[in-house]
Amino acid sequence: MIDTHAHLHLIDRPTTELLDSAANAGVSHVVQVAIDLPSIYKNLNDYAFVSNCSITGGIHPLSVSDDVDLDAVLALLKQHIDRFVAIGETGLDYKYGNDNKKMQHLFFEAQLSFARTHQKPVIIHSRHSDEDMLKIVNQYPDVKKVFHCYATNYDFFEALAGDLNYVSFTGMITYAKKGKVIRSMREVPM
């Protein structure tokens, strides 16, 4: 079994202990996903050379701010591009309002463009942003995209351009109030 989306950097335990625990649970490989600049560095320093771990690099929409130097992030990703299996976690998240909507768009589009240039897949976080998400991602039909924690309807999936779009469902499918997600899970091709 492979864990395709882990945030081990958020757990205060030694790397070897975390990966040993995963292996004991039957997880043979972990994709360690970055969400901000510190987690990109942590991935490069703690996880990049671990045999049963792959890393990503990217800025999560809730990590976007004036304090984050996008050019510096992209330069760091480029410097270590061969170590990253994907770009992300990136995307759009309007759950807490859209005060930084323009900035989220800027960071997201820059990371999609970077992924296209370097032929890397993108791990996408999308919450309460379907219309804007479609406008942006459909400009990149040639970029492989994984919609992490898919939480919308099947119409969204059908509206995606190209055939390089994948979705992952999480434990939210066990919630009775998530009917549209359960319907999507039944309809999205596996």
Predicted feature descriptions by range:
Residues 1-190:
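Mid-domain alpha/beta scaffold segments of enzyme catalytic cores
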